[in-house]
């Protein structure tokens, strides 16, 4: 991976090229309305320390806000139709192995929260169901359910998938569509007024940016 960018400015500079950064690059270049130039700056080109390399790529539909449920509904649909989204017959099918998350309520207040959340999740298409203690015991007899009032469980589109392959294809497709990846580190961000306008690289260059996407992860000092 080259450490030096080919241009002095880009429409979008993405700091971090792992799952989030490469996803942003993929979706940008998939949008026909976007014709800009994209630079991805990655300091760990082997992704040895990236969170992407250490995740088990789990997904769930049980959230307390509609926007999170909708994001996860789309996430599951994307995994199920991965080959179509890649627009490439060489892309593999990605399996979503569902096992479901089980949330247990031991107070009337939290039981009501689970019921309200399940109703909202069902309305948005999730298969969440409220289980009684007897129903939970019948399915998972190893639980100590003393004091448990109910549980919330979704057996559909809650589990894990092959995130590593998705990441590889995000990056592959972004590069094929002209996204430039470099091995470097962003050490500073230039601000002018209320917006950012450039990044400074460890190698000394200052690169102009119309927009900056910070996907640098939890180890970043930005």
PLM ranges: what are they?
Residues 109, 140-148, 190-197, 207:
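A short, glycine/Asx- and small/polar-enriched loop/turn
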Residues 56-139:
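Dinucleotide-binding Rossmann-like beta1-alpha1 core, especially the glycine-rich loop
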Residues 153-211, 215-219:
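Helical element adjacent to the flavin cofactor pocket in flavoenzyme catalytic cores
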Residues 29-52:
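Glycine-rich FAD pyrophosphate-binding loop
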Residues 20, 46, 219:
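Conserved Rossmann-like nucleotide-cofactor binding loop
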Residues 25, 29-30, 173:
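Gly/Ala-rich phosphate-binding loop of Rossmann-like dinucleotide-binding domains
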Residues 43, 133, 186:
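Active-site loop/turn elements of alpha/beta-hydrolase fold enzymes
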Residues 4-20, 39:
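Beta1/beta-strand and adjacent pyrophosphate-binding region of the FAD-binding site
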């Amino acid at each position: 991976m080259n450490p030096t960018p080919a241009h002095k400015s880009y429409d979008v500079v993405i700091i971090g090229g792992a799952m989030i950064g490469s996803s942003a690059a993929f979706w940008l270049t998939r949008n026909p309305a976007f014709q800009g130039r994209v630079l991805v700056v990655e300091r760990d080109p082997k992704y040895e320390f990236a969170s992407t390399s250490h995740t088990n790529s789990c997904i769930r539909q049980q959230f307390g806000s509609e926007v999170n449920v909708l994001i996860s509904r789309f996430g599951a649909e994307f995994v199920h139709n991965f080959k179509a989204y890649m627009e490439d017959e060489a892309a593999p099918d990605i399996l979503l192995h569902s096992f479901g998350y089980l949330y247990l309520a031991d107070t009337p207040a939290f039981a009501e929260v689970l019921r309200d959340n399940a109703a909202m999740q069902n309305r948005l298409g999730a298969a969440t169901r409220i289980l009684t203690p007897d129903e939970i015991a019948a399915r998972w007899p190893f639980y100590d359910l003393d004091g448990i009032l109910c549980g919330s469980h979704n057996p559909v589109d809650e589990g894990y998938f092959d995130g590593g392959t998705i990441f590889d294809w995000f990056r592959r497709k972004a590069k094929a569509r002209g996204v430039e990846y470099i091995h470097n580190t962003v050490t500073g961000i230039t601000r002018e007024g209320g917006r950012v306008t450039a990044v400074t690289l460890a190698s000394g260059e200052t690169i102009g940016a119309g927009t900056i996407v910070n996907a640098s992860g939890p180890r970043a000092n930005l």
